[in-house]
Amino acid sequence: MEELHEARKDDRTEFQRDYDRLIFSAPFRRLQNKTQVFPLPGSVFVHNRLTHSLEVSCVGRSLGNDVASQLLKKHPALADSHISEIGSIVSAACLAHDLGNPPFGHSGEKAISTYFSEGQGMALKKELSPMEWDDLTHFEGNANALRILTHQFEGRRKGGFVMTYSTLASIVKYPFSSQLAGKKSKFGFFLSEEADYQKIAGELGIIRLSKPDEPLRSARHPLV
């Protein structure tokens, strides 16, 4: 991840830039080709992942602003903090919450997992560590979202989207690795991003629930 970038001179906060950066990104625009519900014939309105994410983001911003307002009324001393940015952080996290979902949603996750556990992908098992293999055989869209946002892909600068740690932590609904996924196969980060998540959690003071010699499990960020 890129930890710092040159200071900007516009009036947007870093959290507002997170939202804007997502809106104009190719991964977010591709959500328009992924259905949120099974498509129906005729004139029935069908949501795709893009419209769903925009709607969720609007609701998240409103709820976040309400929470910030109530906190400031109860704790006026927080006025000089970033508490007023809760709405911006939550709206950006909502915007990104489906970013890692494959086509066909949970069925797509199952198809990817099955390719490695039962299909031709089994040939790769000997090339991977047990933890890497768990990531592939329990493919998870939430973990893939964090990968998209933090990973350096070809042609993109180091740090991926270069988002704030608060926004990144707010999309991690399941703050543990695939080793702890259980039957529901839910987890928050792949092995390739575990060190990044540890860095984020450490900087934000997120409590680690597991022992040092156990697979990583953390508390959730309060804005998840």
Predicted regions, residues:
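Sequence-structural signature of the catalytic-core scaffold of metal-dependent phosphohydrolases
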Residues: 1-11, 23-34, 43, 54, ...
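Membrane-entry segments of alpha-helical transmembrane domains in multi-pass membrane proteins
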Residues: 46-50
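Short hinge/gating elements
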Residues: 39-45
